[in-house]
C-alpha cells in the first residue's frame, strides 16, 4: 500500500451543503431558509436572550451584588501542612512554594489554625489567624507577619 492509495472510509466524510444551485438540488431558490421573514433575510438573526420584543427574563430579575475590585485573595496554608518541615526550620512564602503547599501566590499567604502543629518553626507569612499564631507559639515557634 502506498500513500496515494489511502482513502477515507465509505460514509465517513459528508459532502458540504451547496445551496442556491437550482431547485432540483433540494437547496435551490430559498437555500433552506424557508419563505419570507426575519430568518430569511441577510443577517436576520436575533441576539442571545432576545424574546421577540417581550421583556427578557434577565431584565425582569433584580440586580444584586457587585465585584470588589480591591479584594485580596490569599493562598491558604493550615497548621497540618507545616508538619512537613524539619524542627527548627524557617518557613517562608518561597519555601512553601518549593514544597508544593502553595501553587500560586495571589496576594500572599495566610496561615490558618486547622490541625495540630508538632514541630518548632519560625513562620514568615503575609497573614495569620489568631488561633494559628497561638498554636505556633505554643509549639515553641515564632510567627512574623511580612
Curated annotation (Swiss-Prot):
Residues in coiled coil: none
GO BP annotation list: translation
Matching SUPFAM superfamilies: Ribosomal proteins L15p and L18e
Disordered: annotated span: 1-55
GO MF, one annotated term: rRNA binding
Keywords attached to this entry: Ribonucleoprotein, Ribosomal protein, RNA-binding, rRNA-binding
GO CC entries: cytosolic large ribosomal subunit
InterPro entries: Ribosomal_uL15 (IPR030878), Ribosomal_uL15/eL18 (IPR021131), Ribosomal_uL15/eL18_sf (IPR036227), Ribosomal_uL15_bac-type (IPR005749), Ribosomal_uL15_CS (IPR001196)
Residue ranges with Gly residues bias: 23-35
Basic and acidic residues composition bias: residue spans: 1-13
Domain of life: Bacteria
Record bears the keyword RNA-binding: yes
Assembly, per entry: Part of the 50S ribosomal subunit.
Xref: PANTHER family: 50S RIBOSOMAL PROTEIN L15, LARGE RIBOSOMAL SUBUNIT PROTEIN UL15M
UniProt family annotation: Belongs to the universal ribosomal protein uL15 family.
Role, per record: Binds to the 23S rRNA.
Name of the protein described by the UniProt record: Large ribosomal subunit protein uL15
Species in which this protein is naturally found: Lactobacillus acidophilus (strain ATCC 700396 / NCK56 / N2 / NCFM)
Underlying gene: rplO
Amino acid at each position: 500500500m502506498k500513500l496515494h492509495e489511502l482513502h477515507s472510509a465509505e460514509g465517513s466524510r459528508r459532502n458540504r451543503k451547496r445551496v442556491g444551485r437550482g431547485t432540483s438540488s433540494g437547496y435551490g431558490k430559498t437555500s433552506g431558509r424557508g419563505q419570507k421573514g426575519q430568518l430569511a433575510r441577510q443577517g436576520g438573526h436575533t441576539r442571545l436572550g432576545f424574546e421577540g420584543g417581550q421583556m427578557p427574563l434577565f431584565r425582569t430579575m433584580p440586580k444584586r451584588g457587585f465585584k470588589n475590585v480591591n479584594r485580596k485573595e490569599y493562598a491558604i496554608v493550615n497548621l497540618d501542612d507545616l508538619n512537613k518541615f524539619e524542627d527548627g526550620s524557617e518557613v517562608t512564602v518561597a519555601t512553601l512554594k518549593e514544597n508544593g503547599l502553595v501553587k500560586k501566590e495571589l496576594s500572599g499567604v495566610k496561615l490558618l489554625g486547622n490541625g495540630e502543629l508538632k514541630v518548632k518553626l519560625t513562620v514568615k507569612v503575609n497573614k495569620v489567624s489568631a488561633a494559628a499564631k497561638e498554636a505556633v507559639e505554643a509549639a515553641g515557634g515564632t510567627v512574623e507577619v511580612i
